[in-house]
Regions:
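Acidic, glycine-rich catalytic/binding loops that coordinate metals and/or anionic ligands
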Residues: 69, 75-81, 85-91, 95-172
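Residue-level recognition of short, solvent-exposed, well-ordered loop/turn junctions
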Residues: 16, 22, 72-78
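Histidine-centered active-site/metal-ligand motif
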Residues: 8, 49, 62, 98-100
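Zn2+-dependent peptidoglycan hydrolase active-site motif and core
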Residues: 23-67
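Short, flexible loop/turn elements at secondary-structure junctions
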Residues: 13-17, 36, 49-51, 62-64, ...
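Short, glycine/small-residue-enriched coil/turn segments at secondary-structure junctions
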Residues: 2-38
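Short beta-strand micro-motifs in enzyme catalytic cores
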Residues: 11, 43-45, 97-99
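Terminal peptide-recognition signature
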Residues: 13, 27, 47, 80, ...
Length: 173
């Protein structure tokens, strides 16, 4: 069977179309393209950043087509500078308007076509190239839902507190 891509490698920010996108750090335009396929990125920009001796990239997907008309390869972008806008669903791959932000340590020569999702079986490989973008964004942990307990932890709790005379019906807890 063909395993579906279910692991998201970036962070999505659902905002209105035409919302300005600001650079979280100073950088240089490394690549851009219109990935104009259904359920793809649509207009995409990749910035290259250098912090001390560390080089990494940020990818911005689901932008407006106008964003690509106003940008050039090698263009310097200042910290906090607006450099793009979020696209409409008609131009961003058919998605509800939002910004896809992804941090990438090595583009693997994929540039603007770097994947934003991967198969669960490949999670370890792809997340080694894509650290958590919240380390850059800084949304407080309290803004995220609590992690669900693992199946093993759920089973252990049930075994501890539910009597053997009680039956439960499920394939997996």
């Amino acid at each position: 069977t063909d395993e579906r891509r279910t692991i998201h490698l970036g962070m999505d920010f659902f905002v209105e179309a035409n919302t300005p996108v600001h650079a979280p750090l100073a950088g240089v335009v490394h690549a851009f393209a219109d990935r104009a396929h259904a359920q793809d990125y649509g207009p995409t920009i990749v910035l290259r950043h250098e912090v001390d001796d560390l080089v990494f990239y940020t990818l911005y997907g689901h932008l407006s087509r106008e964003s690509l008309q106003e940008i050039e390869l090698g263009q310097s972008i200042k910290n906090g500078q607006p450099f793009a806008t979020v696209g409409t669903s008609a131009e961003n791959g058919g998605w509800h308007p939002h910004l896809h932000l992804q941090v990438i340590t090595d583009l693997l020569d994929l540039d603007d076509s770097f994947p934003g999702v991967c198969r669960a079986s490949q999670r370890e490989v792809w997340t080694s190239f894509c650290p958590d973008p919240n380390r850059l964004v800084g949304i407080p942990a309290t803004a995220f839902p609590e992690q669900r307990a693992s199946s093993d932890a759920t089973l252990a709790t049930r075994r501890k507190f539910v009597g053997r005379n009680v039956r439960t019906g499920y394939d997996r807890p």
